[in-house]
Amino acid sequence: MAERKARVERNTLETQITVEINLDGTGKANFDTGVPFLEHMMDQIARHGLVDLDITCKGDLHIDDHHTVEDIGITLGQAFKQAVGDKKGIRRYGHAYVPLDEALSRVVIDLSGRPGLLMDVPYTRASVGGFDVDLFAEFFQGFVNHSMVTLHIDNLKGKNTHHQIETVFKAFGRALRMAIEMDERMAGITPSTKGAL
């Protein structure tokens, strides 16, 4: 099997980003973005998705976190799309329910080639440690638009905003892991009746 790795650089007047991803990794992660809470959440993707991530970003944090968070989502989506390749032999679909104390989230993903985000997370607070939680929708929208996946994110229960967000990211990592797994019965076959994704 060919290596499912990618390295993408994205430079704008607002952010300079490098993302390296290995879909067949062990969950190793290295981040230098200037946004610690986002890094904590992306670590959940790596560990629960068993993908290796190395992400660096120099962004206009003197304004706010918006451009940095959104552009990391965009660049991660580009790297993911490149690493997953032609999708032959993968499971394509993935889903996970993840609890953390009182919080419970469900994430379902389809590596469909059609970008779509449906996200319903009724945060109980507007920020966690100074981080604007609305920016997570920007992160996932950026990822979806550039990875060309359909993603459903639902926080089903939760009172602690940190727990709500953490269950979303853990479930996303686990759903991603399921979707990119190779299916021996589908070896060399594209998982679509159209023959292409």
From Swiss-Prot:
It comes from the Bacteria. One of its GO terms (biological process) is L-histidine biosynthetic process. PROSITE patterns: IGP_DEHYDRATASE_1, IGP_DEHYDRATASE_2. GO terms for cellular component: cytoplasm. It catalyses: D-erythro-1-(imidazol-4-yl)glycerol 3-phosphate = 3-(imidazol-4-yl)-2-oxopropyl phosphate + H2O. It is found in: Cytoplasm. It is an enzyme of class 4 (lyase). Keywords: Amino-acid biosynthesis, Cytoplasm, Histidine biosynthesis, Lyase. Pathway: Amino-acid biosynthesis; L-histidine biosynthesis; L-histidine from 5-phospho-alpha-D-ribose 1-diphosphate: step 6/9. SUPFAM superfamilies: Ribosomal protein S5 domain 2-like (SSF54211). Belongs to the imidazoleglycerol-phosphate dehydratase family. This is Imidazoleglycerol-phosphate dehydratase. The gene is hisB.
